[in-house]
Amino acid sequence: MSAIDGLPPLRDVIRRHDLAARKSLGQNFLLDLNLTARIARAAGPLDDVTVVEIGPGPGGLTRALLATGARRVIAIERDERALGALEEIAAHYPGRLEIVCADAMDFDPTPLLGGERAKIVANLPYNIATPLLIGWLCTEPWPPWYDMMVLMFQREVAQRIVAREDDDAYGRLAVLSNWRCETNMLFDIAPSAFVPQPKVTSSVVRLAPRAAPEPCNRAALEQVAAAAFGQRRKMLRQSLKSLGVDPARLAAAAGIDPTRRAETVAVSGFVAMANELNNIRNTKTQT
């Protein structure tokens, strides 16, 4: 990409700005420019699109997004050491890169969007990847402020996001993710593509928000999934007791045999049980 955008190779950028990756920040820098370009392309056409990127580091993916045609990139970076490298990219793409020095866990990018929708594209820091995703999935109101997420995770986490019922990786994260989004595993990235090399393979996942997910109280859905998968080897008639209602009633509302286990229940079944739980609680409140 240095031949395309005229910027120096990433290894030179890292050395010049003393950007040794820090484990405490969950940093693993992706230096393969073919892969950063592939991630950018996975987000679809970027012309006239604002992209929110988390943890850009030395800016490999940032450069790919801009070179691919993103009208504007909002790069949220906590590590002040990376700001100089990002400012060089901003100078190369005048008016198209906005750098925000902030912790993504505490920062709301929506005021910067001015009512526009965006796409989220990021090689997420491993140590905050799942909490960030859950926060985005819990956005209210829905549909959210983003049209798409293309995100990199440790492969084990990626599998938990895209899993379906009867998959070993199916659990609470899959229920929440697939209730609100269409999820797809796109491709894997070997440890050798990163500096430093992580011990595990990474995977890129695309999540496209559903315009109209099945109506459901999100808090109730999270509670039902937590109870069911908290004792995933037990039957629903046992695992759902912690909710303080009759598990058989929840299962019946979903047309599910209460002797089944959580891992066999589709997202629609969890939605039905959550709605029944919410109805029961609302009835108790009114009496």
Swiss-Prot record:
Reaction(s) catalysed by this chain's protein: adenosine(1518)/adenosine(1519) in 16S rRNA + 4 S-adenosyl-L-methionine = N(6)-dimethyladenosine(1518)/N(6)-dimethyladenosine(1519) in 16S rRNA + 4 S-adenosyl-L-homocysteine + 4 H(+)
Keyword annotations from UniProtKB, A to Z:
Cytoplasm, Methyltransferase, RNA-binding, rRNA processing, S-adenosyl-L-methionine, Transferase
The terms describing its cellular component in GO are: cytosol
Q: Which SUPFAM superfamilies match?
A: S-adenosyl-L-methionine-dependent methyltransferases
Q: Is Chloroplast one of the keywords UniProt gives this record?
A: no
Q: Name the Pfam families on file.
A: RrnaAD (PF00398)
Subcellular locations according to the entry: Cytoplasm
Q: Which residues bind S-adenosyl-L-methionine?
A: 28, 30, 55, 77, 103, 123
- Name a GO molecular-function annotation: 16S rRNA (adenine(1518)-N(6)/adenine(1519)-N(6))-dimethyltransferase activity
**CDD domains this protein is in?**
AdoMet_MTases (cd02440)
Keyword Amino-acid biosynthesis found:
no
Q: What is its EC number?
A: 2.1.1.182
Family of the protein in this entry = Belongs to the class I-like SAM-binding methyltransferase superfamily. rRNA adenine N(6)-methyltransferase family. RsmA subfamily.
Q: What does this protein do?
A: Specifically dimethylates two adjacent adenosines (A1518 and A1519) in the loop of a conserved hairpin near the 3'-end of 16S rRNA in the 30S particle. May play a critical role in biogenesis of 30S subunits.
By its UniProt entry, which NCBIfam families does this protein fall under?
ksgA
Name of the protein: Ribosomal RNA small subunit methyltransferase A
Q: What organism does the record attribute this protein to?
A: Rhodopseudomonas palustris (strain BisB5)
**Its encoding gene is what?**
rsmA
